[in-house]
Design a protein with these regions (language model features):
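Metallo-beta-lactamase
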Residues: 1-98
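Accessory terminal helices/loops
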Residues: 56-61, 69-239
Length: 239
C-alpha cells in the first residue's frame, strides 16, 4: 500500500476510482509511510501530491483491492483530505523537530495527530511514520552515538553488563519497571539478563509478562496489525 509502484485506474464516466492498494486495506486510515516488512522507502511528499491528484478527480466510488467499496463523493473527498492532511502534519512536525535538534525517539513520543486529523492506525502508525520520515531525510546515522558507525552493537556487551550487575539486580530492576507500567524497559533489562544467562527462568518469565502487557495494550489501543502479529510471534517462539 502507498508504494511508488502502486497504480490506480480512473473511470471518468462512472466516476469510479479503482485504487488498488493506494489507501491500504481500509479507507480512510493512516497510511504506512514505510512498512516494517522490508519494502522500499516510500516518499511522503510524493504520496501527498498523489492524494491531491485523486482529490481533484472527485470520485463517487472507490474500489480497493481489499475490503468493500466506499461510496459517496463527499465521504470520499473528506476521507482523502484527512489522509493527506494527517500525512502532511506528521511530515511537517517531524521536519520541524529535526531542525530543532530533537532525536527521532523524542519525536516518536511527542508527535500525535490533532483531533481534526485523527485516523485509525491499524495499518500505519504515526510514531512509525515519524521514524520513517526521519530516516528518509537523514539516512541510517542518527548523530546520537559514535558506536553507530561500527559493526559492534550494544548487545555485544550485554553479557558483560549482566556479569557486572548480577542477575539478581537485573531481575529486580526488570520487575520494578513492569510494576511501574514500563514493559519496554522491562524488555531492555531482560535482554541484558538473558545475554548473561539465556535460560534464566525469572528473566524469561518477566520478558513474557512484558510481551503480554504490550499485546494487551496493542489490542485495546491502536489495534495495529503489524504490532499485534509481531508480539504474538514473539510469545509463540518463546522457550
Amino acid at each position: 500500500a502507498e508504494g511508488a509502484d502502486n497504480a490506480v485506474l480512473w473511470l471518468p464516466q462512472q466516476k469510479v476510482l479503482i485504487s488498488g492498494d493506494f489507501f491500504g486495506p481500509q479507507f480512510p486510515q493512516f497510511p504506512n509511510i514505510f512498512t516494517m516488512r522490508g519494502e522500499k522507502v516510500r516518499k511522503p511528499v510524493e504520496y501527498i501530491k498523489s492524494l491531491d491528484r485523486l482529490i481533484a478527480l472527485n470520485p463517487d466510488v472507490i474500489l480497493p483491492s481489499h475490503l468493500d467499496p466506499t461510496i459517496g463523493a463527499e465521504k470520499i473527498r473528506k476521507g482523502m483530505q484527512r489522509i493527506r492532511d494527517a500525512v502532511q502534519y506528521v511530515h511537517d512536525e517531524t521536519i520541524a523537530g529535526m531542525n530543532a535538534g530533537k532525536t527521532v525517539n523524542q519525536l516518536m513520543k511527542e508527535i500525535k495527530l490533532p483531533p481534526n486529523f485523527e485516523l485509525v492506525q491499524n495499518h500505519g502508525r504515526v510514531d512509525w511514520a515519524v521514524k520513517s520520515i526521519w530516516e528518509y531525510y537523514m539516512g541510517w546515522f542518527r548523530f546520537e552515538s559514535t558506536t553507530e558507525l561500527y559493526p559492534i552493537p550494544a548487545q555485544d556487551v550485554y553479557a558483560d553488563l549482566a556479569q557486572i550487575a548480577g542477575n539478581e539486580n537485573l531481575i529486580a530492576l526488570a520487575n520494578n519497571y513492569l510494576i511501574q507500567g514500563e514493559p519496554v524497559k522491562t524488555l531492555h533489562i531482560t535482554e541484558i539478563a538473558l545475554a548473561g544467562d539465556p535460560q534464566n527462568a525469572s528473566a524469561l518469565a518477566l520478558r513474557d509478562q512484558a510481551l503480554v502487557e504490550l499485546l494487551e495494550r496493542a489490542e485495546n489501543g491502536l489495534r495495529n496489525d503489524y504490532e499485534i502479529y509481531w508480539l504474538k510471534s514473539q510469545l509463540d517462539t518463546a522457550p
